[in-house]
From Swiss-Prot:
The lineage of its organism: Bacteria, Bacillati, Cyanobacteriota, Cyanophyceae, Leptolyngbyales. This is Uncharacterized protein in chlN 3'region.
């Protein structure tokens, strides 16, 4: 079933790219030790209790299987048109910086600009401006 899913994901992402969508995929890679620290903070700090689910602790028992599954996903769905960016996430400041840098670089590479306005449209805008400014 997974091979079929991987192909579907790749085809969907290729479709998006062919239709002008930029696909950026980030995996925020938190170490097992850091995850434990964050879970304990969520339990110990009442204002963070809402972030913790008992199932989080149970699922940690399957850490190695999750890591293998993630690796399988990355190997099968990272493509030239929709790559995965695996970002170390133990230090939030670094994670935010790395993700922001990739987004900014991608946006710059698109060479985006505002649409140009034709002379006819510019005249219409000036006329609309006169109408608005003449209101009482």
């Amino acid at each position: 079933i997974w091979d079929k899913r991987f192909k579907q994901i790749n085809h969907f992402e290729q479709y998006l790219v062919e239709n002008g969508i930029v696909v950026l995929k980030f995996f925020l890679n938190v170490s097992k030790e850091q995850q434990k620290k964050r879970f304990l903070a969520r339990i110990n700090e009442p204002e963070k209790n809402w972030k913790f689910s008992v199932s989080d602790a149970k699922e940690r028992q399957h850490w190695d299987q999750y890591m293998e599954a993630f690796e399988d996903v990355f190997n099968n769905t990272s493509t030239s048109y929709a790559p995965w960016y695996i970002i170390p996430a133990d230090h939030k400041w670094f994670t935010r910086l790395a993700v922001s840098d990739i987004i900014v670089s991608t946006l710059k590479s698109l060479h985006l600009s505002y649409p140009t306005v034709s002379e006819v449209r510019r005249a219409e805008l000036l006329e609309a401006k006169k109408v608005l400014e003449s209101e009482e």
